[in-house]
């Protein structure tokens, strides 16, 4: 049980995947999902528990799935995809006893995901088939997919790749990721009319064909220590350009992820850690 209605206490688990941190709530006992105000309050790092996103464990929605999960950003908005969150939900379900065996399926707000337990605290998650057509991202003003787009933004031209991994991503290749204008350009692209649903913006540096470095400015959150779907997006955009191999290590400020994509209509597979931090109760 996650909540005690009489006392207002909310039970939770704090987790992270490569530094992308989450508050996990089990709603399968009938506890209602958080509204935008409660989600933002819970995610507040000064007055709440503090996290990038809230993950809610729910009853499965598809045949064969062991459970489903919802995603709430730190500003209270709902999200449809979260790769690091998928791994943390998988690990939570294994510890809870809901998920049995080495392979199982979980439902995100976007789709069902196949999960595989690896060594230690590592999990692999099938993240779906990347969508490059502008209408599917969505990216307005362009009729057909291309390797690189250009937009005039406040007097400068920003060049980027674009893809949907169940959520929209723009990928900006840079020479040095440490010096990338993550917050400034990230916020400008998110506010640009070309992205009607806003966009997650990744800044990626190719170290060598098997290794990239990445920083991500996320919708509804800002820059995070890691973004799983952002790592997938950066990898597949670079793979499409022939800049990296089909199996690539992605170094983020909070840790390491590995992204594999055979290409065409195959699913992207992301692997990385899912770490328990602590269990607690929040007096709301």
Swiss-Prot record:
Coiled-coil zones: none
Amino-acid biosynthesis among keywords: yes
UniProt subcellular location: Cytoplasm
Pfam families membership: DAP_epimerase (PF01678)
MF-aspect GO terms: diaminopimelate epimerase activity
Pathway the protein contributes to: Amino-acid biosynthesis; L-lysine biosynthesis via DAP pathway; DL-2,6-diaminopimelate from LL-2,6-diaminopimelate: step 1/1
Binding sites annotated in the UniProt record for substrate: 20, 53, 73, 83-84, 167, 200, 218-219, 228-229
Transmembrane regions: none
Site (Important for dimerization) location in chain: 278
Site (Could be important to modulate the pK values of the two catalytic cysteine residues) location in chain: 169, 218
Keywords from the UniProt entry: Amino-acid biosynthesis, Cytoplasm, Isomerase, Lysine biosynthesis
A single BP term in Gene Ontology: lysine biosynthetic process via diaminopimelate
Highest taxon listed in the record's lineage: Bacteria
Active-site residues per Swiss-Prot or TrEMBL entry: 82, 227
GO cellular component: cytosol
Catalytic activity: (2S,6S)-2,6-diaminopimelate = meso-2,6-diaminopimelate
EC number: 5.1.1.7
NCBIfam families (alphabetical): DapF (TIGR00652)
HAMAP family in UniProt: DAP_epimerase (MF_00197)
Function: Catalyzes the stereoinversion of LL-2,6-diaminopimelate (L,L-DAP) to meso-diaminopimelate (meso-DAP), a precursor of L-lysine and an essential component of the bacterial peptidoglycan.
Quaternary state and interactors: Homodimer.
Family that this chain belongs to: Belongs to the diaminopimelate epimerase family.
Name of this chain's protein: Diaminopimelate epimerase
């Amino acid at each position: 049980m996650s909540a005690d209605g009489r006392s207002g206490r909310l039970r939770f688990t704090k987790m992270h995947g490569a530094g992308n941190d989450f508050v996990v709530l089990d709603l399968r006992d009938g506890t209602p999902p958080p509204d935008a105000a409660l989600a933002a309050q819970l995610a507040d790092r000064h007055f709440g528990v503090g996290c990038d996103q809230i993950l809610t464990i729910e009853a499965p929605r598809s045949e064969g799935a062991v459970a489903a999960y919802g995603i709430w950003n730190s500003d209270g908005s709902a999200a449809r995809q979260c790769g690091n969150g998928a791994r943390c939900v998988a690990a939570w379900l294994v510890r809870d006893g809901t998920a049995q065996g080495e392979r199982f399926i979980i439902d995100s707000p976007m789709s069902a995901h196949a999960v595989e337990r690896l060594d230690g605290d590592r999990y692999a998650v099938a993240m779906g088939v990347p969508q490059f057509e502008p209408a599917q991202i969505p990216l307005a003003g362009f009729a057909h997919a291309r390797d690189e787009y250009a937009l005039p933004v406040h007097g400068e031209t920003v060049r980027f790749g674009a893809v949907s991994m169940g959520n929209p991503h723009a990928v900006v290749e840079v020479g040095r990721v440490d010096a990338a204008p993550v917050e400034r350009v990230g916020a400008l692209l998110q506010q640009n009319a070309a992205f009607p649903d806003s966009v997650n913006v990744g800044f990626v540096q190719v170290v060598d064909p098997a290794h990239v470095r990445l920083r991500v400015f996320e919708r509804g959150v800002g820059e995070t220590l890691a973004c799983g779907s952002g790592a997938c997006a950066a990898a597949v955009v670079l793979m499409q350009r022939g800049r990296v191999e089909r199996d690539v290590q992605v170094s983020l400020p909070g840790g390491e992820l590995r992204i594999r994509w055979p290409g065409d209509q195959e699913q992207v597979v992301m692997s990385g850690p899912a770490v328990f931090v602590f269990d607690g109760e929040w007096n709301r």
